[in-house]
Structures are given as structure tokens and as C-alpha cells.
């Protein structure tokens, strides 16, 4: 990998030059507590030391709402509507959000590529930035706190500038086109980088092993936590909309006022909505709020056997923005036995039966 240094005094000039490559988006402060990725007119408004944006960068690639095709019911045909996307740059993406995009890639690009997602992914330039964790961050436990790839450039803060890692041919071109703004990395810079990474690791609130989380979630399907926390849940879906990896959508046909023409659109859906598991005939795969609440925890941490990865990147958004003050990481730690001295007796006695039946998909009195 190639490493260069961008001196602090050249930062804004480099950011300004990025606009020559397309629209520039970066984190800006939108209120006392909140940040969001917005199009940048004035590069001096960019926030380099933000904790997290409300919406993850997935919104640029997987649109909250988009038209798929148009139709005319008088004709046996339809016309696909694929947006013409101009190149764009997203600056200031944290490592956990980069991992989030990589997970979305496994869903929308592997096997059967989604053309709507793909066209945006091909046009987007990703520039990551280092960060210090706050009390909500647990990306270190998900091993998503340091990005090895998935970016064109990655900026690591130094006392007098940035150590820049170059991750793609596009990243090389960005540096080479502006080579006069960059310098070689010195021994002093390497020491500063090492010191920053050491302090960053020490700043995390939690330092523990979550390696058996998936299995404990499968075993603890009736843990009392599910009832307690589901009762608090407002089923608003904000944990889904702010999540970097939530990818469910619903599809609807919209007929225009002429009653003949229309279009099909897809829009983000939430597994916390009752309608999410509702199918023809009125059957609902997850009829209760508890079912839906528990399903999200399983989706993020247990439904990953095929890909061998967690669908949670530890960004902390679902906890930080939850209006009911439900702690996602706190609930997982309860399942892991890290926030309670011992399991309730009724739970520990039934674990062997429930665990075997659940994991093996076997049901019956003899299990």
C-alpha cells in the first residue's frame, strides 16, 4: 500500500480540488449534537472530528426511495428507470461505515447485482477518516474499527496533517494529480500514527470477547430481556434507517391519476413494522413486537453463517438515536452474561433443549 502525508495547511486546498472530480459530500454539523453527510459548498464547514452522522453513507448508494420502472397497463411492456449518476466523492467516512458498505456490496453486488445500487457504487469515491470512539462505539468488538480496504483514500490524523493511505487506482490518481500538495511520510509521522492508534484503542469503553455471541443468541431465545426491552420499543424503525447495513425494502406500484400509466418504486422498510412480516392470506411470520425486536438482534449477529461476518459494524447509531433509550450493546452484553451476575434459573435449565431444537430446526416432545 502507498502512504503519503498531506500537511495540515494543504488540507482545504486538496478538498477544494476534489470538486473537480464531482460533487463533494462530507460530514457537517446540523445542530448542537447531530451531524450529517451533506453536499459541500464551503470546505471549511467540514467536520473532521465528528462522532457519527445520523444517516450512514449507504443513503448515497441505496436510496431511501427510488423509481424502478414505468408502465402503461394498455401495453405489455415497461421501461426501466435507471438514474444517470455523475461521479461524486464522499469525504470523511469512518472505518465502521466503510465496512457497512462492504456488507451491502455482498448483498447488492454478489451473485445477482442490483443495477440501481451498482451504478452509484461505480461512480462513488470513498475517502475515509480516522476517529476517536465515544461511549456508544463498539466497532472494536466487531473488528470494524480499522479499514484494510473499501476506500480510495484514508486519512489518519497527525499533529501537523494527515497520513494518507492509498487504497485504489482512483486513489493513486487523486494523489498524483495533486502531488505538489503531498509529502513523504517521516519517522516522526509514523510515531505519531502509532501513538494515535494506541490512544484510539484505549479509548473504547468495552474490551471483551464476543466470539460466542451468535451461539448465545440462538440459545437464549426466551431470555427475559426480550420481553423487557420489546415492551419499551416504539417500533418506529429508526434503528433500521440509521443502520449502515439494514437493507430491507418494500415495493409498491403507483398508478397515476389517468388510471393507465404508473410506476413501480421501492423504499426502505423496517423489520420493526408489523407489515414487514405480513404475507398473502393474512399470515405474519413475526406477529408480535417481541418477535420483531428479537429478529433484528438475530439478523445483525446470528444470520451470517453463509458469509461468515456480522451484519453489525458497531457504529452505535441504533443506541445513540433510539427515542426509547434502548441500548443495543447493553442488551447484547446481557445475553453474553456481562451485565448480570448469573442467568435466571428458569433460563439456564432450559438452554440445552431450546438451543438444540433451534439450531437443528427440530421440533417435538422428544427434543
Curated annotation (Swiss-Prot):
pH dependency: Optimum pH is 8.4 for sulfur reductase activity at 80 degrees Celsius.
Thermal properties of activity per the entry: Optimum temperature is 80 degrees Celsius for maximal sulfur reductase activity. Activity increases linearly from above 30 degrees Celsius to reach maximal levels at 80 degrees Celsius and then decreases to 15% of activity at 90 degrees Celsius.
Domain 4Fe-4S ferredoxin-type: 222-254, 303-332
Reaction(s) this enzyme catalyzes, per UniProt: n sulfur + H2 = (n-1) sulfur + hydrogen sulfide + H(+)
Disulfide bond annotation, renumbered to this chain: none
The keyword Nucleotidyltransferase is assigned to this record: no
Keyword field: 4Fe-4S, Cytoplasm, Iron, Iron-sulfur, Metal-binding, Oxidoreductase, Repeat
Keyword Zinc: no
Molecular function terms, GO-annotated: 4 iron, 4 sulfur cluster binding; metal ion binding; sulfur reductase activity
Gene3D superfamilies: Alpha-helical ferredoxin
Pfam families xref list: Fer4_22
Enzyme class: oxidoreductase
EC number: 1.12.98.4
Main location: cytoplasm
Activity control: Stimulated by rubredoxin at pH 7.6 but not ferredoxin.
Cofactors demanded by this protein: [4Fe-4S] cluster
Cofactor binding: number and manner: Binds 2 [4Fe-4S] clusters.
Residues annotated as binding [4Fe-4S] cluster 1: 233, 236, 239, 243
Binding site residues for [4Fe-4S] cluster 2: 312, 315, 318, 322
Superkingdom per UniProt: Archaea
Any Gene Ontology CC annotation: cytoplasm
PANTHER family: ANAEROBIC SULFITE REDUCTASE SUBUNIT A (PTHR40447:SF1)
Subunit structure and binding partners: Heterotetramer of alpha, beta, gamma and delta subunits. The nickel-containing alpha and delta subunits constitute the hydrogenase activity. The beta and gamma subunits (flavin-containing dimer) constitute the sulfur reductase activity.
Functional summary from the UniProt entry: Part of a bifunctional enzyme complex that functions as an NADPH-dependent hydrogen-evolving hydrogenase with sulfur reducing activity. May play a role in hydrogen cycling during fermentative growth. Activity not exhibited with NAD. The beta and gamma subunits form the sulfur reducing component that catalyzes the cytoplasmic production of hydrogen sulfide in the presence of elemental sulfur. Not active in the presence of sodium sulfate, sodium sulfite, sodium thiosulfate or cysteine.
Protein known as: Sulfhydrogenase 1 subunit beta
Record gene name: hydB
